[in-house]
Amino acid sequence: MLSPVLIAIDGSSASHGLLELAQQYCQPGLHRLHVLLAVDSAFSLSDGPRAISLYEQQEFPAATDEQRHAVAAVQQALRRLRALGFESEGKLAQDDPVTAIVSEAQRLDCALIIIGHRHLNRLGRLLDPSISNKVIDQVKCPVLVDSRQT
């Protein structure tokens, strides 16, 4: 049985670093990699890839763009991981990142979570606490945080 590893991407260029860490610390044949991207429900049309209707494109242009970007980011990550020989699955979640990551990690009974870190100043951390810190406080599995600046 393959050990599940959750890679929480955000669709930014920092996601490439998370995939590099997965390649470095995980092995095909030993780990199944699960890519998760959480999208704010105000800017999401669905929890997965599906055709976006003309109505949605006209009435919700920001959500349409966000949905397309999220789907493309997950698909690109999966292509890269599969090309490296990993069994992998992807998921979009309409939720705040902490809730989405914690619930998916619990559902999968993850052996590891790989997550990024935003480098905020003190005021930024006070106003918008770290997602990675919140995840670490709520899960029972190890969390590998990519603290490299992109």
Give each language-model segment a name.
Residues 1-57, 86:
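Small/aliphatic-rich secondary-structure junction motif
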Residues 34, 89, 144:
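Conserved beta-strand positions in the Rossmann-like core of class I SAM-dependent methyltransferases
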Residues 50-54, 107-109, 131-132:
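Short, hinge-like loop/turn segments at secondary-structure boundaries
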Residues 55-72:
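A short acidic, glycine-rich active-site loop
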Residues 76-113, 150:
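Structural beta-alpha unit
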Residues 112-138:
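Glycine-rich, Arg-bearing micro-motifs that act as flexible, cationic patches
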Residues 141-150:
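Short, flexible loop segments at boundaries between secondary-structure elements
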